[in-house]
A protein has these predicted regions:
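M16 family metallopeptidases and their MPP-like homologs
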Residues: 1-6, 28-135, 153-161
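Glycan-association/targeting regions that enable binding to alpha-glucans and other polysaccharides
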Residues: 150
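Short, exposed beta-strand-loop hairpins at the edges of beta-sheets
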Residues: 145-147
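His/Glu-based metal-binding/catalytic segments typifying zinc-dependent metallopeptidases
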Residues: 1-22
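Carboxylate-rich, divalent-cation-coordinating active-site regions
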Residues: 25
Length: 165
């Protein structure tokens, strides 16, 4: 969950960006298997101890086993080795730009400040979002991968079309 350790949540968010970059490099650029692999990370603001990272892809059903293999391989690599300074910058820069741009909208502030009157941690989290993201290191990304991208808590979901349709 986010409030148990906001910096860890930011570390995990950057790790998710690195995972997505690697999936794009492998699946789109390397294999031409799909155009848009996606990674989503969620740290609950409500339920203690809850959060997830998910990777998804639109791919022909025959490509699913290879996708799962690639995700596991990339996850293991993120757990076992530090990422380069270049890869860290490529993960953080777009995220920081996205945050800065979002902060110019009312929707961002409505979402960020929702509930702040009853939970002041939300204000602290909003204030520290950019500096906390800037602070993420390659070691932090590796620690996040070791904590989250574990084989023992990973599960796969396949959504396939009905046969013949």
């Amino acid at each position: 969950d986010f409030f148990a350790n906001p910096q860890r949540a930011r570390d995990t968010a950057v790790m998710g960006e690195v995972l997505e970059l690697r999936l794009i490099e492998e699946l789109r650029e390397g294999q031409g298997a799909t155009y848009s692999p996606s990674v989503v990370y969620n740290h609950s603001l409500v339920w203690p101890g809850w959060g997830y990272v998910s990777a998804s892809v639109e791919i022909p059903p025959a490509g699913l086993p290879a996708f799962f293999t690639d995700v596991k391989k990339i996850a293991a690599d993120l757990r076992d080795k530090e990422i380069s300074a270049d890869e860290l910058a490529r993960a953080k820069k777009p995220r920081l730009e996205q945050i800065a741009k979002a902060r110019e909208t009312n929707g961002y502030w409505l979402n960020e400040l929702s509930g702040a009157q009853s939970d002041p941690r939300r204000l602290d989290a909003t204030r520290a979002l950019i500096s906390g993201t800037e602070r993420v290191t390659a070691q932090d990304v590796r620690r996040a991968a070791q904590a989250v991208l574990r084989d023992d808590n990973m599960w796969m979901l396949e959504i396939r079309p009905e046969a013949g349709k």
